[in-house]
């Protein structure tokens, strides 16, 4: 890994971050339990805090962005639906086809310029419209990412 000046934050990916000593101490000293049984007070506090910050009824902690994308896709789609996403989106390029395996969805890819989607091109990918009957899948989810890994 290339060295960066200490005053810069490396936002390329969460996979290049390293916890500082304070973070390691917090992890070592965290009160933990079985999250499935509701016995992990640290996770419970985190979920409650984030839900409160966002004005939501509840929160859900998942251990990775890939897993959170899988949950989001499954929540907002039905099998046979189509997801519209930028051609180099993380969801399409780096997640091993999880959207298809877990949700039964296909993907319509939108070309971009350095990760920036042209709204006209986006609209072209939403093929199901009045009068199309059942010839095209229902585009039930548009995935917009910021930042783009490849743009």
Please provide the spans of the model-predicted regions.
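Glycine-rich loop at the start of a catalytic domain that most often binds anionic cofactors/ligands
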Residues: 71-80, 98
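N-terminal amphipathic/basic leader segments beginning at the initiator methionine
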Residues: 1-26
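Structured catalytic cores of enzymes that bind and process phosphorylated ligands/cofactors
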Residues: 2, 13, 49, 59, ...
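PLP-dependent aminotransferase-class I/II
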Residues: 104-149
């Amino acid at each position: 890994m290339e060295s960066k000046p200490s005053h810069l934050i490396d936002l390329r990916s969460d996979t290049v971050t390293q916890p500082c000593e304070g973070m390691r101490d917090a992890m070592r000293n965290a009160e933990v339990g079985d999250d499935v049984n509701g016995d992990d007070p640290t996770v419970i506090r985190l979920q409650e805090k984030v839900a409160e910050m966002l004005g939501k009824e509840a929160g859900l902690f998942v251990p990775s962005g890939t897993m959170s994308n899988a949950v989001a896709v499954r929540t907002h789609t039905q099998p046979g639906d189509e997801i519209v996403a930028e051609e180099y989106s993380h969801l399409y390029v780096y997640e091993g086809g999880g959207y298809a395996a877990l949700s039964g969805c296909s993907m319509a890819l939108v070309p971009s310029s350095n990760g920036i989607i042209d709204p006209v091109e986006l609209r072209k990918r939403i093929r199901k419209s009045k009068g199309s009957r059942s010839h095209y899948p229902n585009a039930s989810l548009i995935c917009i990412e910021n930042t783009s890994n490849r743009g």
